[in-house]
Amino acid sequence: MESFVAMKVVCILFLFVVAAEAASTKESPAVNPSKGKDRIKFNFPRYVPNHHVFASNLLKLCTEYTPETQARNDGSQATYKPRINDLQVNFKNCTFLCKREFGNVTLNLPVDTPCGPNKQTCADKSKCVGHIPGC
């Protein structure tokens, strides 16, 4: 059980590194799915079509978010990169947790994000349903 948890943590960290690098390129913000046997499994619902692309897009939103109250960088390079967690995506409220160096922030999912098995999207949050992991 402990090795499974450790492996999941390693996989999630690997995803963040790959997604952050892909998000930093101007050509494509999406992470291409792995072609090997080491595919990362996300806890997103089945109605989200491409979990890797979805996670990459959330990471891009998190990276690009700049709060108005945050002071501009003084030119020094920060080693902390923004992060997301697949367990902190709320499909009922169409939000996700963005972990930042200067504190965490809850951001809205894009309006075209699926939020239910019957083609509901975050454009109409009142029709969204909560995700039950494993279902």
From Swiss-Prot:
Location of this chain's protein in the cell: Secreted
Name the segments for region: CD4-binding: 116-135
Q: Which residue spans traverse the membrane?
A: none
Q: What induces it?
A: By feeding.
Task: Determine if Signal is one of this entry's keywords.
Answer: yes
Annotated Pfam families: Salp15
Cellular compartments per GO CC: extracellular region
Question: What's the chief localization of this chain?
Answer: secreted
Q: Which residues are the signal sequence here?
A: 1-22
Organ and tissue specificity: Expressed in salivary glands from feeding female ticks. Highly expressed 4 days after start of feeding.
Residues carrying covalently attached carbohydrate according to the record: 93, 104
What UniProt keywords are attached to this protein's entry? Glycoprotein, Secreted, Signal
The entry's function note states:
Salivary tick protein that downregulates host immune system by binding to both dendritic cells, and CD4(+) T cells. Specifically binds to the CD4 coreceptor on T cells. This interaction prevents the activation of the Src kinase, Lck, and its downstream substrate Zap-70, and results in deficient activation of PLCgamma1, the repression of calcium fluxes triggered by T-cell antigen receptor (TCR) ligation, and a subsequent reduction in interleukin-2 production.
**Subunit structure, interactors included:** Interacts with host CD4. Interacts with host DC-SIGN (CD209). (Microbial infection) Interacts with Borrelia outer surface protein C (OspC).
Family statement:
Belongs to the salp15 family.
**What name does this protein carry?**
Salivary protein 15 Iper-1
Species annotation: Ixodes persulcatus (Taiga tick)
Question: Gene symbol?
Answer: Salp15
